[in-house]
Amino acid sequence: YIDDYMFLTERLENVFPENRNVKLEVFLMLYCEEGEVKLELNNVARHLQANDLLISLPNTIIGQVMASPNHKVKVFCFSNRFIQRLTQTQKYSWKSICYIQENPIKHFGENRNETFHQYLKLIEGKIQTSPDKYQKEILLHIASAFYGEMVAETTRKSIEKEKQGYHTPVKQPDFIFKQFMEALTADN
């Protein structure tokens, strides 16, 4: 499925050309249902196994993608426009973005996995119905809720790390970007 806000596929080669690095201009979520996927995210090796979700922010370089023969994945790409639309209304998203950048892989335990699969079923079910004038809007709302769940979970994780005394130093480009996003949000 593809529209101007999102792209969904079950094939890695639809997103990652063989033996090439790709700089993605989208917010990517790669869910490994079965098997294993290995890749480099900004030249850092990452390894996904069953029930792992990789979250990649825009402008991330992804390369060296390899998958086991029995792999089964779902790839979600959200446009920058869609993510900007969502983050304008969410004040807590900055901490989540910082946490995602440091911890791009999330393993779903049994209870969180069920919630994630409910969203997958909703999205896939709506895609498979015959298109009508409301399909795109409904998909956007489901994707917004899905994104909200993911941000809520990562926000909880980042707050837990802060309480444990872990603090990521703020880098100047991050600080400037945060100020820019706050200015954009205030300029509605």
Residue ranges and their predicted role:
Residues 116, 120-123, 143-150, 180, ...:
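Hydrophobic alpha-helical core bundles mediating ligand binding, dimerization, or RNAP-core interactions
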Residues 48-61, 77:
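Conserved metal-binding segment of the jelly-roll/cupin
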Residues 1, 65-129, 154-157:
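A hydrophobic/aromatic-rich effector-binding and dimerization subdomain
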Residues 108, 130-138, 150-187:
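Short, Lys/Arg-enriched, Trp-marked, Pro/Gly-tolerant hinge/linker segments that flank
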Residues 1-49:
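Generic protein-terminus/edge-of-domain signal
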Residues 39-40, 62-68:
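Short beta-strand His + acidic residue motifs that chelate non-heme Fe in jelly-roll/DSBH
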